[in-house]
Amino acid sequence: SMEVSPLLAADTAGSIAAARHIHHKGRRDNLFVKIPGTPEGVPAIEEAIFLGIPINVTLLFSCAQYEAVSEAYMRGIERRLQAGLDPRVGSVASLFISRWDVASNKQLPDELHNKLGIAVGQQTYRAYRQMLASPRWQKLAAAGAMPQRLLWASTGTKDPDASDTLYISAFAAPETINTMPEKTLHAFADHGELHGVMDVDGGDADAVLARIRAAGVDIDQLALTLQREGAEAFVKSWHHLLDGIAEKARQLAGKSDGAVLK
C-alpha cells in the first residue's frame, strides 16, 4: 500500500487526484492506495473504486465508519457495472483496534480493561458478514465483484499487563485479514492460542459496549476523536519524513560540492 498525503484527509478532490497519480505511476495491479475513511475521504473512496484503483481504507475506528466506506465501495462497483467496466477492484477496510483500549482503559474499571477494541471489532464483523449475506452484495458478487475485506489493524498489545497475543486470538475471523507487528507474530507463533473463531452475530459485543457506556465512556465521540488524532499523527509523521528527506538531500549536496572543490 502507498498512502495519499495525509494533508489531504479533509480534501476529497485532492485525494482523488493523488490516488490517480499514485496508481498511474505505480503501474501495479497489487498496489493499494491508502485513503483515510474520514467524511471527506468516503466520496474519494467511491470515486477511486469507480476508476479501478485498489484502495486500502485507513483510520477506521467504529462500525459506523466501516459501514460508510463499505457503502462507498459498493456504490463504486455498481457504477462500474453500469458503465460496462470490470467489477473486480480490490479493497480492504482497515479497522484500528488497540487504540480504543489505550484511550479508554484509564476511565474503566479493571474488569473492562482491553475490552472496548474487541467489542467494536465484534460489532463491525457482524456488520461485515451481514453485508456479505445481503441481496445487494450477492448480486454484485454474481457479476464478478470481489468483497472489500475487513482488515484488523493496530493489533499489537499496548498494555504490558495484557497478553501480548490478545488481539490475535480475539480476531480469528473468516474472510478477514490481520496485520500485526513482527514482534506480535513471533509471540503468537511461540505461545499464542486460539479458542475458536469470532461469532458472526457479534457475540457479547452489545452487552460489553453497554457496560462501557454505563461506565462513562462516550463511544461515538471517542471514535471521532481517535480518527481525528490518527489523522493528525499521520500528518506529523509525514512532515517528519519530508524533513528527513530534505536533510539527507542537503547532506548529499554538501558532499557533492566538497568533491567538486577537491
Predicted regions and their residues:
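Active-site beta->alpha loop and helix N-cap motifs at the rims of alpha/beta catalytic domains
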Residues: 1-44
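Catalytic alpha/beta core domains of metabolic enzymes, predominantly
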Residues: 53-183
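Short catalytic-loop micro-motif centered on adjacent basic/acidic residues
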Residues: 31-35, 55-59, 221
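Flexible, acidic glycine-rich loops studded with aromatic residues
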Residues: 144-250
